[in-house]
Curated annotation (Swiss-Prot):
Motif annotated as CCCFC, chain positions: 195-199
One Pfam family in the UniProt entry: NMT1
Gene responsible for this protein: nmt1
Identification of the protein by name: 4-amino-5-hydroxymethyl-2-methylpyrimidine phosphate synthase
Biological pathway: Cofactor biosynthesis; thiamine diphosphate biosynthesis
Molecular function GO labels: 4-amino-5-hydroxymethyl-2-methylpyrimidine phosphate synthase activity from histidine and PLP; metal ion binding
Length: 342
């Protein structure tokens, strides 16, 4: 880039779980590191890795599966840290849609997806349930999955437990319908992945930018780590400050999305090697990665002591599901206590 600013492109329009990034800006953490950072939002989330890979933007957010696929397509990007760890992702639907927890109930339905990999995932699942990709209608919705379900344009859509499910639950409440009429069939469970890490949201960067600016990148990550520490220590105050910077965040729905995202924030921002191995294998299974593909991540720009990995990741997933149910019912800020290796 010709500017001395770091340019950073988010994976979505400004969203409650982007709080650490925006707070690093508003609280002056970037400035204290001697950095100027321009925060940008995409028109189409599917363009993010291409824009960063082409060098038009330096850094950004993207999910793990998309980051791997970007390298496979020769877009030179690398993950340098994690924002959200393993947010539950799946087919989100309303109870009156005729869809159930049985994947085969998608037959004959219109299923919305954000970008092409959502369709690839559903297509791949059909073969395990005696179906083909022709047994359902795929509808590309971009950032409008929730609206498409509400309008009846689709019967279900791929979404996040902490975003689209919250939006739909609040819409249901506005219609005097039970909030739990929104349901999710998790893709990780359907695909027997053993983790929901394919949709972990990552900090990614252009490889040439990384090579030329290692100290800048380390400073950037130190600033967002400081902001993450603040979010985890003072979530209510942090959200109010986020609303001050981004008034569009100041709605009851966004507050609930923030509460539901709180448990997913990565405390130490590290890339989890075990998760990368699982998702790389999943990408090979989906046919989007070659057999000899090597994952594109590093923790070398994280200058603090990293937490040990969990000793019970599958158990953590079950406990996280229960914890998120509690937050959905009661609100507030809760996080999982994770057992880790010494």
């Amino acid at each position: 880039m010709s500017t001395d600013k770091i340019t950073f492109l988010t994976n979505w329009h400004a969203t409650p779980y982007h709080a650490p990034l925006y707070l690093a800006q508003s609280k002056g953490y970037f400035k204290e590191e001697g950095l100027k950072v321009a925060l940008l939002e995409p028109n189409d989330p599917s363009d993010v890795t291409e824009i960063i890979g082409s060098g038009k933007v330096d850094m950004g957010f993207k999910a793990m599966i998309h980051t791997l696929a970007a390298k496979a397509r020769n877009f030179p990007v690398t993950s340098i840290g994690s924002l959200l760890d393993e947010p539950f992702t799946g087919v989100v639907y309303l109870k009156d849609s005729g869809i159930t927890e049985d994947f085969r109930s998608l037959k004959g339905k219109k299923i919305g997806y954000v970008g092409e990999f959502g369709k690839i995932q559903i297509d791949e699942l059909t073969k395990y349930y005696g179906m083909t990709a022709d047994d359902y209608t795929a509808v590309r919705c971009g950032m409008n999955v929730t609206k498409a379900i509400i309008r009846g344009d689709i019967d279900a859509g791929i979404g996040l437990e902490n975003v689209q499910m919250v939006e739909l639950a609040e819409w249901l409440a506005s219609q005097n319908r039970p909030r739990d009429d929104v349901q999710i069939v998790r893709i990780d469970q359907l695909a027997e992945l053993g983790c929901c890490c394919f949709c972990s949201i990552l900090y990614i960067a252009n490889d040439a930018f990384l090579a030329a600016n290692p100290e800048k990148v380390q400073k950037f990550m130190r600033a967002v780590k400081r902001a993450t520490d603040y979010v985890l220590a003072e979530p209510a105050a942090a959200f109010e400050e986020y609303v001050d910077m981004k008034p569009i965040m100041g709605t009851p729905v966004n507050r609930k999305i923030f509460e539901r995202s709180f448990a997913y924030f990565s405390r130490d921002l590290k890339n989890v090697s075990r998760d990368w191995a699982k998702v790389t294998n999943y990408g090979k299974r989906l046919g989007i990665l070659d057999a000899d593909f090597q994952p594109n991540y590093t923790n070398q720009y994280l200058s603090w002591t990293l937490d040990a990995d969990s000793t019970d990741p599958l158990g953590d997933q079950k406990r996280m599901a229960e914890l998120q149910k509690e937050v959905a019912c009661e609100g507030g800020f809760k996080r999982l206590q994770v057992a880790s290796s010494a």
